[in-house]
């Protein structure tokens, strides 16, 4: 079956309209807060979705959250949760060795592991997970999908965790072969924050695997000019980025920001179909994160 961009975008909007709310909002954001976020979002010639929530109070602010956005590599965070769930269950072992053959390393895709080991080799599950999360390797991503039974497994996990508004339908290789499929791998910003919150509260993983994934995300090597771009070094950012193909279909960053006082904020920013450059999109993401951390009333309350 051939999917068109308009069809997939339409599916996203319908799915979004039918999905139930996933983030309880304790207090509505002041109008000034919403206006400030909208001003940043409207500075780009793009569709921008941003949602932030203080994890201790539930106070939230959002713009463009009625739309589902293509995740691109952000979905590797969701995949990592599914893999580590099976580690917790004993079905997988972080130290188990996985043999990768040369023909499994697709050439025309982002793959730091292939660049280092073009002939493949033997790797621990832990290392493949690290390369997938921290370096956003597309080949190791698809190997992990195959290991747990495909994208359907991840979608079932999301349902089990009570998360609606996130869709994981296609692998990296499938999106590479048909770029329009990226629109089916979608998320609303607040839905991603719901997943980040469940992860942080220990509702998905055991303590050891939760800490492992947190450390991997805190050491993310991609997108350093996005959420982290304008924050001082005393802010910890555990995050996962996502980027589109040759056209600026997606410039994303999602994660948890730990403020110097120890408070935590889940933030998800998705930029879709931008007519501006990737650096311009990244600058806006960085500005949003800085505003949230330094000027948003909910963050400054304690």
Residue ranges and their predicted role:
Residues 10-22:
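Bacterial N-terminal signal peptides
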Residues 25-70:
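Beta-lactamase-like hydrolase cores
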Residues 29-40, 146-147, 151, 194-225, ...:
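Structured C-terminal helix/loop/strand segments within mature extracytoplasmic catalytic/sensor domains
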Residues 49-54, 61-62, 78, 99, ...:
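Soluble periplasmic/extracytoplasmic beta-strand elements of cell-envelope proteins
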Residues 58, 70-100, 132, 267:
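Active-site SXXK
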Residues 85-105, 151-156, 206-210:
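Short, well-structured active-site flanking segments
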Residues 105-142, 151:
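Conserved catalytic neighborhood of penicillin-recognizing serine enzymes
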Residues 121, 142-201:
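Mid-domain, small-residue-enriched loop/turn segments at the edges of structured enzyme/sensor domains
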